[in-house]
Regions:
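Conserved phosphoryl-transfer catalytic core
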Residues: 69-125
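Conserved Class I SAM-dependent methyltransferase catalytic core
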Residues: 263-313
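S-adenosyl-L-methionine
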Residues: 1-39, 44-51, 75, 136, ...
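Class I S-adenosyl-L-methionine
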Residues: 295-342
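Conserved S-adenosyl-L-methionine
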Residues: 31-87
Length: 342
């Protein structure tokens, strides 16, 4: 796997394994220079598009994704030094105990919560691109502390807090040792710093990250290729499963606002999205097959675009978080559609 992808946070809906399939039907940057990513998510598609030389305009309503866009897509030269990591541990008069009060020991251990309360105060005080890089490091740190990135697993964190090693799942104990979960936070932060720095590069383009509602974003940008990866109907909504992470990142308890794509009829929200996308001459759409089958999706896209290529791939996002039955029937639907620029 391309080593720059390690800079990104692990994301349940990530497209790292599908990058070659997504890009194989697309015109090169010399023919279609501007790549628009309307649902940035974990950032793998935008980072790959940047590496290929497209000018990337990416967007996501979630702050966790916007952090990725600012730190790795928009940023083309600023990296983190060892001193930046050291400053995360310095006492800060604006430090609160928000994370320790609300998220230990259910989400992270008390020791890690105290570090994170200090680290977030220092990261938010940083200036310019360094702020986004440090916030990305802390997002990756939190996800690294979670069993397979799963925020629903409280028992294991309670066992770590109490030192009940013999009672713990041995698979997680091995994983925890591999990821140095019990080590000093600075050692983990140094590993994450190096990962993030490897993802910072220039492609000679002026790339931009936005944090907007998708329909507002689509009205305001122009481009040649539009990548659409909306939340899949019938699956766990990110805003619910990542509520704890979003709250920690915001510094306050947030209540999830369900996406229009996660509730209601899937075809209605998709049709509205496609209608708002008609100005773009090339679409790439990725979607899950939980509620919408490939044939239905093709018919819907054909209402707006004359040339449609459709493929279906067996795809598992996180093996440890899905049943054998789910892995067997799960498919990633991929559509490339072409029309005329309007």
């Amino acid at each position: 796997m391309w080593n720059r992808l390690a800079a990104l946070p692990p994301y349940f809906g990530g497209k790292r394994k599908l990058l070659r399939q997504i890009f194989k039907h697309l015109p090169p940057p010399v023919e279609a220079p501007v790549f628009v990513d309307a649902f940035l998510g974990g950032g793998s598609v935008s980072l790959f598009a940047k590496a290929r030389g497209y000018r990337v305009l990416c967007n996501d309503v979630a702050l966790r994704s916007f952090v990725v866009g600012k730190a790795l897509i928009e940023n083309d030269h600023v990296t983190l030094g060892q001193g930046d990591v050291t400053r995360l541990f310095q006492e800060n008069g604006n430090r609160s105990d928000f994370i320790e009060r609300h998220y230990s020991p259910d989400v992270v251990t008390t020791r890690h919560a105290r570090f994170l309360d200090t680290a977030f105060a220092n990261a938010r005080a940083a200036v310019g691109t360094k702020k986004w890089l440090l916030l990305l490091l802390l997002v990756k740190f939190i996800l690294r502390m979670r069993p397979m990135g799963n925020f629903g697993a409280k028992t294991i964190i309670h066992q770590v807090e109490a030192g009940e090693w013999e009672a713990m799942n041995p698979h997680y104990v091995r994983d925890m040792l591999t990821r140095n979960v019990c080590g000093h936070p600075k050692r983990v932060a140094e590993v994450l710093r190096e990962q993030i720095n490897a993802g910072v590069f220039s492609n000679g383009q002026e790339n931009r990250a936005y944090q907007q509602d998708v329909f507002e974003f689509l009205r305001g940008v122009e481009g040649d290729i539009l990548y659409l990866d909306p939340p899949y109907a019938g699956t766990s909504a990110y805003e619910t499963s990542l509520k704890a992470l979003d709250s920690i990142l915001e510094g306050l308890r947030v209540e999830p606002k369900p996406s229009v794509f996660s509730r209601g009829k899937a075809t209605e929200s998709l049709e509205r999205l496609f209608e708002a996308s008609q100005r773009f001459p090339v679409w790439v759409l990725s979607y899950g097959n939980r509620e919408v089958q490939l044939e239905t999706l093709v018919r819907l896209v054909e209402k707006f675009m004359p040339v449609v290529v459709a493929e279906s791939y067996r795809y598992t996002h996180l093996t440890g978080l899905s049943s054998a039955e789910h892995r067997e029937r799960n498919r990633e639907l991929l559509i490339v559609a072409k029309g005329k620029k309007r």
